[in-house]
Amino acid sequence: MKTMHRSRSWRRKYVRTPGGRTVIHFERKKPKVAHCAMCGRPLNGIPRGRPNELRKLPKTKKRPERPMPNLCPSCMRRIMKAQARATL
């Protein structure tokens, strides 16, 4: 095993080869789930993936198509209500 693969920053994936042997493939771990910028709740609609995996996705799969996609829906509603009330 290579020295760099001894650390736990690499995920171990056990793969059965056609010859019947079980070998270990090393993969980088997935990043943490995206969180709301205000309350810190996990965001839905944003995939977990390394940058090279996300690069292959279309733009609509990378983030929600609504105003303020970095906020959860409840925080977004709260801000939009405050903005609407401030303009009156």
Swiss-Prot record:
| GO molecular function annotation | structural constituent of ribosome
Annotated region (Disordered) at 41-72
GO terms (BP aspect): translation
The record's keywords, sorted A to Z, are: Ribonucleoprotein, Ribosomal protein
Q: Which Pfam families match?
A: Ribosomal_L34e
Q: Which domain of life is it from?
A: Archaea
InterPro entries the UniProt entry points to: Ribosomal_eL34, Ribosomal_eL34_C_sf, Ribosomal_eL34_CS, Ribosomal_L34e_arc-type
In the record, the note on similarity to other proteins reads: Belongs to the eukaryotic ribosomal protein eL34 family.
Q: What is this protein called?
A: Large ribosomal subunit protein eL34
Q: Which organism is it from?
A: Thermococcus sibiricus (strain DSM 12597 / MM 739)
